Swiss-Prot record:
Compartments in which it is found: Cytoplasm
Entry's cofactor comment: Binds 1 zinc ion.
GO cellular component: cytoplasm
Gene name linked to the record: ybeY
Name by which UniProt lists this protein: Endoribonuclease YbeY
InterPro entries: MetalPrtase_cat_dom_sf_prd, YbeY, YbeY_CS
Phylogenetic lineage: Bacteria, Pseudomonadati, Pseudomonadota, Gammaproteobacteria, Pasteurellales
Length: 154
C-alpha cells in the first residue's frame, strides 16, 4: 500500500484538543488506501468564520459546517498525485461530538475519513450512495478501532 502525504494547516487560534498530524495521516491513509505511489492532500483546520464563508461561497449554505471537501481536478494529460483539500471546522466538530456523545478523537477521525472518501468521489446525495458511503465509513472507522459513527442513527 502507498502512503498519503498530508499538508496540515492549522488556521484556528485554539489548538487544544486537536488531533496530531500523525493521527490525521493514519486516518486519511485508512480512508484513501492508496495503491503504490504516494498521494497528497491538504487538511486545513479552521474556525467557524472561515468554514461559514467557504460553505456559503461553494455550497450556498449560510452556516459553518463540519467538513468541506475540494477534490483536485487535474487535466487528463497531467499526472499529479494530488487528491484535493479538506477543510474541517474545529468548533463544529467539537460541538457535534458533544451533542452526539462521541469521543472527540473519534469524531475527528470520522471527519477525515468522510472527507477523504469525498475526495475519492463518494457522495451521499442519493439514498443508495449514502448507504454505500456510510457502510464504507463504518468499516474504515472500525478498522481504526472506533465505533460505528452512525450507531446513534440506527
Amino acid at each position: 500500500m502507498g502512503s498519503v502525504l498530508v499538508d496540515l494547516q492549522i488556521a484556528t487560534e485554539n489548538i487544544e484538543g486537536l488531533p496530531t498530524e500523525e493521527q490525521i495521516v493514519q486516518w486519511a491513509t485508512a480512508a484513501i488506501q492508496p495503491e503504490g505511489n504516494e498521494v497528497e492532500m491538504t487538511v486545513r483546520i479552521v474556525d467557524e468564520a472561515e468554514s461559514h464563508e467557504l460553505n456559503l461561497t461553494y455550497r450556498g449554505k449560510d452556516r459553518p459546517t463540519n467538513v468541506l471537501s475540494f477534490p483536485f481536478e487535474c487535466p487528463d494529460e497531467v499526472e499529479l498525485p494530488l487528491l484535493g483539500d479538506l477543510v474541517i471546522c474545529r468548533q463544529v466538530v467539537e460541538r457535534e461530538a458533544a451533542e452526539q456523545e462521541k469521543p472527540l478523537m473519534a469524531h475527528w477521525a470520522h471527519m477525515v475519513v468522510h472527507g477523504g472518501l469525498h475526495l475519492l468521489g463518494y457522495d451521499h446525495i442519493e439514498d443508495d450512495e449514502a448507504e454505500e458511503m456510510e457502510s464504507l465509513e463504518t468499516q474504515i472507522m472500525q478498522g481504526l478501532g472506533f465505533d460505528d459513527p452512525y450507531l446513534a442513527e440506527k
